[in-house]
Swiss-Prot record:
Gene3D superfamilies: Ribonuclease Z/Hydroxyacylglutathione hydrolase-like (3.60.15.10). Binds 2 Zn(2+) ions per subunit. It comes from Roseobacter denitrificans (strain ATCC 33942 / OCh 114) (Erythrobacter sp. (strain OCh 114)). Belongs to the metallo-beta-lactamase superfamily. Glyoxalase II family. This is Hydroxyacylglutathione hydrolase.
Amino acid sequence: MPIEILTIPCLNDNYAFLVHDTATGQTALIDVPEAAPILKVLAERTWQLSEVWITHHHADHVQGLGDILSAHPAQVRGAARDAHRLPALDVELRDGESFDFAGHKVDVMDVSGHTVGHIAYYCADAKAVFTADSLMALGCGRLFEGTADQMWDSLSKLAALPSETQVYSGHEYTAANARFALTIDPHNPDLISRSEGITAARAAAKPTVPSTLATEAATNPFLRAADPAIRAHLNMQHASDSEVFAEIRARKDAF
């Protein structure tokens, strides 16, 4: 494989990701919840970190950066609009821009909602999008700063990527998300089957990240605001998609 992606558990339920180009040896890190497990994998693989891509400013996604940079003097990328509350950036990124990583195009997507200024990184060559706390496995991030309309727009942008795209989200929340999803979409056979698989995976201490956009489109209630069965279940047949999404998000907040 020209691109290898490793999922690294951090803290209690965070994930960091290493993206390694096998042809050039270049390695990028997406988010830095803590340094120790990331440094361990880099040492085991004898990889030298060349870049760090930050998704948003929350401490559990950036707090290990200083220790990482002490061991690996990598270039740090992040959102220009969030630069005032991120660690020092070498490259400031804006929505719609792209950059080169080891000969692979990486697209920058503003996915505000969880925070304002949250970005995702999409690499078509890797068939991967790194969404952190925007689109999550069977869920989406809580709206700490943005509005429901903003998050719905962000999720809609992500959902428009190719269906085979692997979704690398920032937390292992999937089992709890599945329990909630079944209260919104209880008769969805794909969701029921996926929920059973998640239970088995977690019992075996296996990660449920990544998923695919096709899987999320079929099972994630936060992407399915237009679905007639969900609208009927919520008695919101005549509401807008963003209104249905907002109701689902409100119910999740209280779940």
